[in-house]
């Protein structure tokens, strides 16, 4: 099992939690982004630079992903592709996307997109807070305990 991180939009505090988890468990983790970023020295933590472009990181993650791998992303269409391929997807707020909930999340995303396209200001997600960080750390720990 590997961890893949959609790193372009992943909050720094979530990356720090992931770095600690990779070092603690020895699970291989790869951050995928279209710009350079620092990663701590570790045989378990890797970085993959992809070309700039719409969904370039997403496409690379889906291409490299094996069934059973975990992907960290807030991108719902990417999460849907991961689940379709037999992987697991966890967002930075600690929500595990599943076969049971991904269609609902996609429908809500599409609905919000249509509202924005018609000129309605839907606002954005709330800032990541301490309870979100804790929820992510707890869910990640639960996942790794079951799958490593």
Curated annotation (Swiss-Prot):
Leader sequence residues: none
InterPro entries hit by this protein: UPF0178
Family: Belongs to the UPF0178 family.
PANTHER family documented for this protein: UPF0178 PROTEIN YAII
Protein name from the UniProt record: UPF0178 protein Pcar_2632
Gene source species: Syntrophotalea carbinolica (strain DSM 2380 / NBRC 103641 / GraBd1)
């Amino acid at each position: 099992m590997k961890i893949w991180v959609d790193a372009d939009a992943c909050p720094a505090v979530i990356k720090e939690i992931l770095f600690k988890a990779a070092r603690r468990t020895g699970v291989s983790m790869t951050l995928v982004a279209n710009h350079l970023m620092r990663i701590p020295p570790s045989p378990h933590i890797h970085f993959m630079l992809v070309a700039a472009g719409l969904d370039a990181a997403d496409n690379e993650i889906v291409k490299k992903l094996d069934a059973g791998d975990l992907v960290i992303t807030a991108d719902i269409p990417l999460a849907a592709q991961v689940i379709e391929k037999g992987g697991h997807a966890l967002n930075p707020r600690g929500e595990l996307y599943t076969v049971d909930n991904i269609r609902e999340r996609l429908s809500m995303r599409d609905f919000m997109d249509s509202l924005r396209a018609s000129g309605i200001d839907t606002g954005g997600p709330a800032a990541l807070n301490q309870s979100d960080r804790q929820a992510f750390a707890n869910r990640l720990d639960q996942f790794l305990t079951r799958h490593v």
